[in-house]
């Protein structure tokens, strides 16, 4: 075989390279087209759940006194929801809804998860961490858990354990929680992560009597809300003057209430610093832009008139969401969403909506509104409360629209029961010792403890929910229409208490 001439060799080589380049370009172009047609890669998911953080104590929600610079910055970079509601103002039941998309009367978490209560979800329930793990996510949790059984709410990695409201738990030290989360965030594992970051703050802190009994009794001193002289690693305490705090309208403006609100504010500011440290870790790892960040609370502020009630201070909560590829930072979303919608939304963002989602979940995805876009059909929410502690049986079912709220007190002849942390709060104790024990804020103590079967409020005209319209003939049509909505809700969500309609 004759050797090729240099010119021939050059031409042949050029042709071969051109052919290779064309093939390579076609391959890359095809890959690009294929990628553009495919759904985006699922993002990391960071779900931050505070404990008893009401709408009343965040700068971005209008409080000019509280210092929450990190959560305010997250709101400026994401979307702030103004009509977000938990479905029950009680810790374990609310968390079960957050992580299943089912109301607690359906998933079985009727009340608080403690050994003496034995409330837990049904074994057949599939939770968010399990579904995300099946979809290829790395799942981890840190901080407060307070739901059961662990087999239903299984996380691949448990970064910390601690009893609920344990004074020594890691859930009071949010910077340490963030540091424990660092390996999960910084891992080189190509799989996305789901991190459940649940603080004990700003829940009231408890102590133990010599015989080991839990107590919240600090009267006449305010509950410390987890604040302690020794402080916490990485935290710069922000101390508030009781004279400066803003007393919510449903609370009495008393020295006791102000002293406790000052402690509550300090716990919120500590929580905010932990969130800031966590987000800084995300940014330094280069994963902030590809992480869905959700900040919520399980229920409202731990004061009588909010927590464990179905009044708005217990149900209407902060919700700040920063979605990857957001186009409108600082957006405001006024759609009415509830915590039953969170699991369907997160799975939708993760491209893992199950085919039976409509039947499996009591909520629905609001992914289309994560960037502040107008959502249609999100104009009412439902709430369902049955127990808090085991002795606190007081089932309530609620429908709230933009104008009206109907509360059905199913066991209305009973005296409204008190959670231990609220009963022993100096704010409540001092109110019962003043004004002849007649008023708690603008509501009479008698009205707080003894409620009628139905409560109907015009939220727009009566945001304090003080004037019950249920017995007013002028509102009979409104009341009856909302009752029918409640019945359909209970049927649809398989509420065992629906049977009371037939025999009472």
Label each region the model flagged.
Residues 39-43, 52-65, 82, 89, ...:
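Active-site-proximal cap/lid insertion segments
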């Amino acid at each position: 075989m004759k050797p090729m001439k240099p010119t021939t060799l050059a031409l042949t080589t050029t042709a071969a390279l051109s052919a290779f380049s064309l093939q390579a370009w076609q391959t890359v172009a095809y890959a690009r087209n294929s990628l553009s047609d495919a759904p985006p890669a699922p993002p990391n998911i960071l779900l931050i759940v505070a404990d008893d953080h009401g709408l009343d104590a965040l700068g971005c929600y209008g409080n000019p006194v509280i210092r929450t610079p990190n959560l305010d910055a997250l709101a400026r970079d994401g979307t702030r929801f103004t009509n977000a509601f938990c479905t029950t103002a009680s810790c374990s039941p609310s968390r079960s809804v957050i992580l299943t998309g089912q109301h607690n009367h359906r998933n079985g978490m009727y009340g608080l998860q403690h050994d003496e209560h034995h409330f837990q979800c049904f074994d057949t329930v599939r939770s968010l961490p399990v579904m995300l793990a099946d979809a290829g996510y790395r799942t981890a949790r840190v901080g407060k858990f307070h739901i059961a059984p662990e087999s239903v709410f299984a996380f691949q990695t448990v970064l910390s354990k601690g009893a609920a409201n344990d004074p020594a738990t890691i859930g009071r030290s949010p910077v340490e929680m963030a540091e424990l989360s660092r390996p999960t965030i910084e891992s080189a594992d190509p799989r996305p992560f789901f991190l459940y970051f649940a603080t004990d703050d700003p829940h009231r802190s408890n102590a133990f009597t010599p015989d080991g009994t839990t107590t919240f009794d600090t009267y006449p001193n305010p509950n410390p809300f987890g604040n302690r002289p020794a402080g916490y690693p990485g935290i710069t305490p922000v101390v508030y003057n009781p004279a400066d705090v803003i007393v919510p309208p449903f609370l009495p403006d008393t020295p006791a209430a102000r002293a406790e609100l000052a402690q509550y504010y300090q716990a919120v500011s500590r929580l905010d610093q932990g969130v800031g440290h966590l987000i800084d870790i995300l940014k330094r790892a280069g994963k902030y832009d590809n992480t869905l960040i959700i900040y919520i609370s399980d229920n409202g502020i731990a004061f009588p008139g909010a927590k464990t009630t179905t009044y708005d201070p217990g149900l209407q909560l902060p919700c700040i969401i920063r979605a990857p590829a957001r186009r409108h930072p600082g957006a405001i979303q006024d759609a009415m969403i509830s915590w039953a919608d969170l699991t369907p939304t997160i799975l939708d963002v993760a491209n893992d909506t199950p085919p039976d989602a409509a039947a499996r979940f009591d909520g629905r995805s609001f992914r289309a509104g994560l960037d502040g876009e107008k959502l249609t059909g999100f104009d009412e929410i439902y709430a369902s409360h049955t127990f808090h502690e085991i002795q606190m049986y007081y089932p309530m079912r609620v429908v709230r629209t933009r104008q009206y709220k109907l509360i059905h007190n199913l066991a209305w002849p009973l005296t409204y029961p008190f959670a231990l942390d609220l009963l022993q709060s100096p704010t409540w104790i001092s109110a019962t010792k003043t004004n002849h024990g007649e008023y708690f804020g603008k509501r009479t103590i008698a009205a707080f403890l003894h409620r009628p079967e139905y409560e109907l409020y015009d939220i727009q005209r009566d945001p304090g929910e003080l004037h019950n319209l249920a017995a007013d003939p002028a509102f009979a049509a409104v009341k009856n229409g909302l009752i029918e909505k409640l019945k359909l809700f209970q049927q649809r969500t398989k509420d065992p208490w629906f049977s009371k309609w037939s025999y009472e």
